[in-house]
């Protein structure tokens, strides 16, 4: 079977949920027995989002092979339950840098390097590479931003050319457009959707399907009007309405026959998607019997997207305990030893996620200290693990001024130090310890029990600093347990205090591998204990 290509674009405005549409369609097609992969095109000039501010971009999602990517890849993985790779996120910066490198090497043999054909050819190559490296039957490529944006023009042209290159039966264009709801007048307006589809046609692409983003349902008459003006079959005009839970969306799209229309267009003979298990999960999620409050102490809490995988992993873990997770967003900059009880005291558990830089670290340390002294279930992630070690060094071992070398290069007690292979690294981007690495688990530890007594777990990392092994013996003597280490025993991966209800911190990012129907084990145990603690 020829590889099938589905392109998801957006018009009118950005942030309409194109990624959720792509992820939901991917789940439906996977449940038809098809092998699906998904890809995100980001037209910005950064090589990747690794050095971008979380306030600008939100979370950086890390793949198994160590690519720093757009947060939409997290949605793709969680919805479809697949592991993506470095070819699943392509930026203008990445493409242009590769082309310029080739030009400097003389690989274009003296040709004038241009947007067409050189940039468009490389974009088409990236699409095909993402499909071939995963042996996918179908690749869904989402283009970030809005059709008509100056920076996205080469991407749209590459998508246009794909139809002629691989055949009309192997390509489908899905355009996501907004329907404006004027609440005061009680009216729905379609002109933005019509003009957005017209703009796509001006670039040579006729949409095969429209997905209408709306707060309220659209009438059949309005659907038919949009279909006529946009030259799309009425049955291929799909509504994507606001929902209580994101995981309802695949079911809503299936109810409108979206996946069957896609299969018909692409000449795919695939059985109907069996969504029984997914539907049962959604029913469970919408009828949780318990509630648990978790304090998330972070430095980017004004933008929840900066912690989207963390919050989703907490929710997934809550599902397994039949509990809705109520997140109390606590700005680490506001936390002190004096007010920490007021800010986190009503929480049944505390999570201290990752981050970079000095701002907010003392507040995180105060929250960790509060959790340790009051036996509140605590989970530390990445920097959260490093600061767990710093707090223990200061307040249990009595090492006044102990810190991470990253945050205080003058400290007498650098309990967190730079990794040996990072000492001479000058570039910030793409140089961290990234991707999937193993952690060997200690017998009898809380971590090993959480992971069902596995000997080794593989989890994704994103860090440059590590626990300083010069202090390991002193920590162990004081009851600090190193419950997960690298197979060569050199890198600390998990730490815990065994005399607490749950006091565990890990260097890796377990949330990146959590799924709604398969929650990550460390998060699951954390929430289970927090639910018990809230009784």
UniProtKB/Swiss-Prot annotation:
EC numbers on record: 6.3.4.2
Annotated Mg(2+) binding sites: 72, 142
Binding site for ATP: 15-20, 72
Primary enzyme class: ligase
Catalytic reaction annotation: UTP + L-glutamine + ATP + H2O = CTP + L-glutamate + ADP + phosphate + 2 H(+); L-glutamine + H2O = L-glutamate + NH4(+); UTP + NH4(+) + ATP = CTP + ADP + phosphate + 2 H(+)
Pfam families per record: CTP_synth_N, GATase
Region Amidoligase domain: start-end pairs: 1-268
InterPro entries: Class_I_gatase-like, CTP_synthase, CTP_synthase_N, GATASE, GATase1_CTP_Synthase, P-loop_NTPase
Positions of L-glutamine binding: 55, 355, 383-386, 406, 464
Residue positions binding UTP: 14, 189-194, 225
GO molecular function: ATP binding; CTP synthase activity; glutaminase activity; identical protein binding; metal ion binding
Regulation: Allosterically activated by GTP, when glutamine is the substrate; GTP has no effect on the reaction when ammonia is the substrate. The allosteric effector GTP functions by stabilizing the protein conformation that binds the tetrahedral intermediate(s) formed during glutamine hydrolysis. Inhibited by the product CTP, via allosteric rather than competitive inhibition.
Active-site residues, Swiss-Prot/TrEMBL: 382 (nucleophile), 509, 511
GO biological process per UniProt: 'de novo' CTP biosynthetic process; pyrimidine nucleobase biosynthetic process
Chain positions recorded as CTP binding sites: 14, 149-151, 189-194, 225
Signal peptide as annotated in the record: none
UniProt pathway annotation: Pyrimidine metabolism; CTP biosynthesis via de novo pathway; CTP from UDP: step 2/2
Record-linked HAMAP family: PyrG
NCBIfam families, per database record: PRK05380.1 (NF003792), PyrG (TIGR00337)
Miscellaneous notes: CTPSs have evolved a hybrid strategy for distinguishing between UTP and CTP. The overlapping regions of the product feedback inhibitory and substrate sites recognize a common feature in both compounds, the triphosphate moiety. To differentiate isosteric substrate and product pyrimidine rings, an additional pocket far from the expected kinase/ligase catalytic site, specifically recognizes the cytosine and ribose portions of the product inhibitor.
Subunit and partners: Homotetramer.
Function: Catalyzes the ATP-dependent amination of UTP to CTP with either L-glutamine or ammonia as the source of nitrogen. Regulates intracellular CTP levels through interactions with the four ribonucleotide triphosphates.
Protein name: CTP synthase
Species of the source: Lactococcus lactis subsp. lactis (strain IL1403)
């Amino acid at each position: 079977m020829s590889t099938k290509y589905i392109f998801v674009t957006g018009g009118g405005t950005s942030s309409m949920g194109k990624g959720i549409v792509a992820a939901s369609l991917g789940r439906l097609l996977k449940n038809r027995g098809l092998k699906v992969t998904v890809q995100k095109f980001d037209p910005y000039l950064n090589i990747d989002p690794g050095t971008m501010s979380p306030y600008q971009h939100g979370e950086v999602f890390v793949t198994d092979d160590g690519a720093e990517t757009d947060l939409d890849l997290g949605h793709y993985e969680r919805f479809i339950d697949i592991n993506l790779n470095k070819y699943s996120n392509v930026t203008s910066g990445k493409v242009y840098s590769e082309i310029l490198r080739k030009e400097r090497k003389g690989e274009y043999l003296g040709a004038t390097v241009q947007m067409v054909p050189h940039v468009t050819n490389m974009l088409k190559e990236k699409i095909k590479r993402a499909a071939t490296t995963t042996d996918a039957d179908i690749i869904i490529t989402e283009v970030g931003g809005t059709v008509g944006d100056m920076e996205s023009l080469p991407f749209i042209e590459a998508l246009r050319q794909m139809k002629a290159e691989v055949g009309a039966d192997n390509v489908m264009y899905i355009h996501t457009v907004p329907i404006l709801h004027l609440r005061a007048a009680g009216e729905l307006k379609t002109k933005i959707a019509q003009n957005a589809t017209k703009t796509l046609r001006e670039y040579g692409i006729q949409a095969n399907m429209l997905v209408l983003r709306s707060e309220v349902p659209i009438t059949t008459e309005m659907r038919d009007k949009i279909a006529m003006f946009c030259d799309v079959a009425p049955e291929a005009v799909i509504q994507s309405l606001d929902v209580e839970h994101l995981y309802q969306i695949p079911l809503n799209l299936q109810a409108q026959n979206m996946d069957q229309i896609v299969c018909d267009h692409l000449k795919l003979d695939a059985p109907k998607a069996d969504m029984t298990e997914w539907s049962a999960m959604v029913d469970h999620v919408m009828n949780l019997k318990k509630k648990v409050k978790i304090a998330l102490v972070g430095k980017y809490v004004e933008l929840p997207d900066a912690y989207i995988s963390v919050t989703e992993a907490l929710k997934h873990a809550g599902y397994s305990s039949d509990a809705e997770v109520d997140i109390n967003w606590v700005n680490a900059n506001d936390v002190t030893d004096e007010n920490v009880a007021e800010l986190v005291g009503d929480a049944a558990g505390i999570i201290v996620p990752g981050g970079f830089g000095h701002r907010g670290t003392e507040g995180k340390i105060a929250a960790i200290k509060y959790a340790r002294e009051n036996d509140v279930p605590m989970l530390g992630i990445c920097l959260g693990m490093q600061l767990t070690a710093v707090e223990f060094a200061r307040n249990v071992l009595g090492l006044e001024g102990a810190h991470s070398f990253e945050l205080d290069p003058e400290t007498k007690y650098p309990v967190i130090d730079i990794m040996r292979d990072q000492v001479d690294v000058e570039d910030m981007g793409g140089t961290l310890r990234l991707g999937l690495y193993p952690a060997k688990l200690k017998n009898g530890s809380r971590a090993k029990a959480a992971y069902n007594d596995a000997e080794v777990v593989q989890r994704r990392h994103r860090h440059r600093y590590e626990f300083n092994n010069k202090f390991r013996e002193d920590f162990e003597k004081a009851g600090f347990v190193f419950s997960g280490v690298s197979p060569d025993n050199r890198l600390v991966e998990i730490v815990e205090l065994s005399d607490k209800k749950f006091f565990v911190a890990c260097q890796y990012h377990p949330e990146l591998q959590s799924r709604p129907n398969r929650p990550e084990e460390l998060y699951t145990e954390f929430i289970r204990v927090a639910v018990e603690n809230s009784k």
